[in-house]
């Protein structure tokens, strides 16, 4: 069953006062996006005059500064929410003092607090020496620890890690994960190094972070990112636990995305891709938004294209395929493939593992041109930043752009998509599945017990006794004893009757997190009359939450 904003499921969680009439909300949203005024203006739906906090951040080039890109999006959200933040302050101050306080805290939130730049030597297997460069940026400590991945790439720069760290702050706030934002990068191409050399680099980088106080269970917790995975996270955990964390019982909580044997959690590998799926699901099943786009709700008749067939792209493709959408194109750095009849994710994964590339896949042909401009309903950029620009945005044919990567859309492209009535589901919401499940893993490490272990047998026995109680009640009612009225669980209930596994709990928690956050974004978009500008709505939500922490904590040392 497809939803309209504000119906029973949402009302039961947020309360009727939080949302108002479902019909009125949907009508207001639909009217705004089509450029029609609402029949009767409602509270919160008045158009907002945006303040231009930073004109310099509005870079109009195809390759804008990444950090200024994020700052520009922040400024857009801040200009909208400032009046509400002033209004909500419950202090004995004048209007001017309140506004100064709000603007001051917004200036505190925006910059990157710490950036560590380091270099260290390694001896390679052939006996030569090389100096490795690396960075770690901590954007905000309004919540600790800081959280953010480590990527290995020759494109790593100070600007990139600062931008990604700031995105992590807002991302965590959007999905209510209590972390500050951080990011790290090591400037190497991992394909040019042996496994032994990569282990040396990873362990030495960990020690350099530890010496500077940039890693620890309560300080800064890295995670996998581009070209890193379980193996690298295991090396980091072992290095920290064997050295500076030797006496810390929580040492293995210094990093997430670890193998299960090292304190990892079931469902972490696929978490970001699964989060992308749930994020798309929440909007594609929303009848009001689909009506705006001229589409029918649900995945059944939808086609999609994935740019980037790494961890995020693969698992996004798997889940969309499983729920009825058809993948017609996949793009990688060395080329793209196309099949209008559909591409099976498992077959493509096996082919790439065997051949090292998607090119040559027998059930698809090579796609000439940019896969970003291919004909589809849903486009999932899941590669790197700044892929959708002012140059190619007018040629994008998809009606929904689901940002699986960080920062794939430049501000100018974002503006073009809004003008063309294309829905962009923003990165700071859509790819938050990874950090959400990383949070679950971190909690598991601090609790030193896996999810479900303490309740597994109790739940199974409770379900058994419930069924027996129902059966005995029916037998007493109809005077038949001895099991002549058996109560047989349905197949779906039978799957759950033995209790939830750790993976079940993780998947359920992730789905709920993405659903709740999507509802918050939808409500904010309606409240501020933003229509399809979901990115600004997400930034508004993030800014409100981070602002509240700073404001209530106080700013004594200023």
UniProtKB/Swiss-Prot annotation:
The catalytic site is made up of: 183
Modified after translation how? Answer: Acetylation of Lys-84 is observed in liver mitochondria from fasted mice but not from fed mice. ADP-ribosylated by SIRT4, leading to inactivate glutamate dehydrogenase activity. Stoichiometry shows that ADP-ribosylation occurs in one subunit per catalytically active homohexamer.
Residues given in the record as ADP binding sites: 450, 516
Phosphoserine: residues bearing it: 79, 128, 227, 384
For whether the record's keyword set contains Hydrolase, the answer is: no
Stored InterPro entries = Aminoacid_DH-like_N_sf, Glu/Leu/Phe/Val/Trp_DH, Glu/Leu/Phe/Val/Trp_DH_C, Glu/Leu/Phe/Val/Trp_DH_dimer, Glu/Leu/Phe/Val_DH_AS, NAD(P)-bd_dom_sf, NAD_bind_Glu_DH
Gene Ontology CC annotation, any one: mitochondrial inner membrane
Q: Which residues carry this modification: Phosphotyrosine?
A: 135, 512
**Leader sequence segment:** none
Residues that the record marks as modified (N6-acetyllysine) are 84, 90, 110, 162, 171, 183, 187, 191, 211, 326, 346, 352, 363, 365, 386, 390, 399, 415, 457, 477, 480, 503, 527, 545, 548
Q: How does it assemble?
A: Homohexamer. Interacts with HADH; this interaction inhibits the activation of GLUD1.
- What function is annotated for this protein? Mitochondrial glutamate dehydrogenase that converts L-glutamate into alpha-ketoglutarate. Plays a key role in glutamine anaplerosis by producing alpha-ketoglutarate, an important intermediate in the tricarboxylic acid cycle. Plays a role in insulin homeostasis. May be involved in learning and memory reactions by increasing the turnover of the excitatory neurotransmitter glutamate.
Give the protein name, as stated in the record.
Glutamate dehydrogenase 1, mitochondrial
Q: What is the scientific name of the source organism?
A: Mus musculus
């Amino acid at each position: 069953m497809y939803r309209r904003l504000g119906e029973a499921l949402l009302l039961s969680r947020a309360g009727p006062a939080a949302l108002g009439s479902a019909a009125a909300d949907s009508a207001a949203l639909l009217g705004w996006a089509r450029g029609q005024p609402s029949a009767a203006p409602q509270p919160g739906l008045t158009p907002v005059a945006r303040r231009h906090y930073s004109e310099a951040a509005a870079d109009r080039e195809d390759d804008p500064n990444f950090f200024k890109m994020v700052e520009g999006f922040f400024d857009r959200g801040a200009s909208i929410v400032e009046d509400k933040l002033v209004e909500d302050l419950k202090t004995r101050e004048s209007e001017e003092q309140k506004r100064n306080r709000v603007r001051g805290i917004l200036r505190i939130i925006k910059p990157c607090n710490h950036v560590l730049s380091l270099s260290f030597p390694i001896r390679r297997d052939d006996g030569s020496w090389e100096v490795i460069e690396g960075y770690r940026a901590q954007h905000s400590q309004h919540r600790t620890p800081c959280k953010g991945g480590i990527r290995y790439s020759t494109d790593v720069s100070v600007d990139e890690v600062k931008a990604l760290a700031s995105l992590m702050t807002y991302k965590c706030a959007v999905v209510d994960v209590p972390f500050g934002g951080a990011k790290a990068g090591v400037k190497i191409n991992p394909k040019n190094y042996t496994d032994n050399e990569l282990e040396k680099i990873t362990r030495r980088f960990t020690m350099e972070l530890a010496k500077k106080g940039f890693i620890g269970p309560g300080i800064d917790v890295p995670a996998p990112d581009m070209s890193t995975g379980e193996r690298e996270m295991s090396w980091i955990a072992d290095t920290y636990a064997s050295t500076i964390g030797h006496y810390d019982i929580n040492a293995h909580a210094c990093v997430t995305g670890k193998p299960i044997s090292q304190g990892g959690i079931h469902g972490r590998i696929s978490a970001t891709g699964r989060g992308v799926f749930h994020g798309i699901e929440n909007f594609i099943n929303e009848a009001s938004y689909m009506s705006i786009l001229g589409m029918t709700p649900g995945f059944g008749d939808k086609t999609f294209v994935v740019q980037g067939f790494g961890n995020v792209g693969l698992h996004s493709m798997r889940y969309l395929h499983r729920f009825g959408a058809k993948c017609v194109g996949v793009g990688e750095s060395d080329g793209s493939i196309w099949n209008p009849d559909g591409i099976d994710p498992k077959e493509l994964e096996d082919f790439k593992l065997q051949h090292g590339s998607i090119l040559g896949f027998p059930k698809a042909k090579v796609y000439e041109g940019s896969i970003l401009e291919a004909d589809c309903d849903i486009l999932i950029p899941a590669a790197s930043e700044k892929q959708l620009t002012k140059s190619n945005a007018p040629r994008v044919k998809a009606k929904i752009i689901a940002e699986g990567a960080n920062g794939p859309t430049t501000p100018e492209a974002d503006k073009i998509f809004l003008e063309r009535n294309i829905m962009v589901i923003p990165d700071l919401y859509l790819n938050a599945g990874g950090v959400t499940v990383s949070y679950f893993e971190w909690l598991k490490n601090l609790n030193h017990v896996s999810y479900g272990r303490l309740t597994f047998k109790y739940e199974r026995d409770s379900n058994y006794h419930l069924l027996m109680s129902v059966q005995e009640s029916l037998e007493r009612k109809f005077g038949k004893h001895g099991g002549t009225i058996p109560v047989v669980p349905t197949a779906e209930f039978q799957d759950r009757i033995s209790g939830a596994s750790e993976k079940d709990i993780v998947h359920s928690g992730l789905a709920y997190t993405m659903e709740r956050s999507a509802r918050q974004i939808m409500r904010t978009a309606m409240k501020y009359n933003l229509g399809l500008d979901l990115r600004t709505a997400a930034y508004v939500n993030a800014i409100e939450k981070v602002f509240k922490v700073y404001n209530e904590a106080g700013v004594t040392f200023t």
